[in-house]
Amino acid sequence: ANKIIRNAIDSKDKNTDNFREFTANFYSRGLFKVKEAPEKILGQSLGDLGGGLDSTRTGIIYLSETVSEITFQKKPRNFKEKIIASKVSGSDNGISFNRAEQANFDFYGNTVFVAESNLVSPISDVAFGYYTFILEGSFYDKNGRLINKVRVLPKRDNDRVFSGFIYIVEDDWAIYGIDLIAAGKQ
């Protein structure tokens, strides 16, 4: 796994240039999960947030899923999205995760800006200081390319990092996909 990640880090510039424009299918899921919510905030009762909290005052209070087709061009910047399906559960209070453009994250940089925090990319130049990598397996995509599935594990609990999986194309060392969640203290 370390060799795969090193190759992906070494190929970042090449792969960023190769993806000046693309079309892709996009799926996103966003949720707000609350742990141990207080009874009141600034003297105002929270209740059970519309039935989203259990007896320990923990629960998912908002869930949004979207499937869309996106087209992206880097220069000049152009982004188009056609939403195929969208489902929202809970009160959004004006907040929505239903747009792909809001999730336009660049993992080829050293950090990824998520929810007001810069998190260390798994293929950052300093990734090995923050992550442990484990090769979980490989598979061939429909174009016959070998895809490596690499588990991404934070080394420390308090770092602003991700946890999950990154998929890297063999020989090109490009990111094929990600399945990551923000981890650590944000």
Q: What does each model-identified segment do?
A:
Residues 2-147, 152-161:
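Structured extracytoplasmic
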Residues 164-168:
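Hydrophobic/aromatic beta-strand elements that line small-molecule binding cavities or substrate pockets
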Residues 142, 170-171:
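Short, ordered coil/turn segments that flank beta-strands lining enzyme active or ligand-binding pockets
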Residues 183-186:
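Short aromatic loop motif centered on NTY/YTY
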Residues 174-175:
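Hydrophobic "anchor" residues
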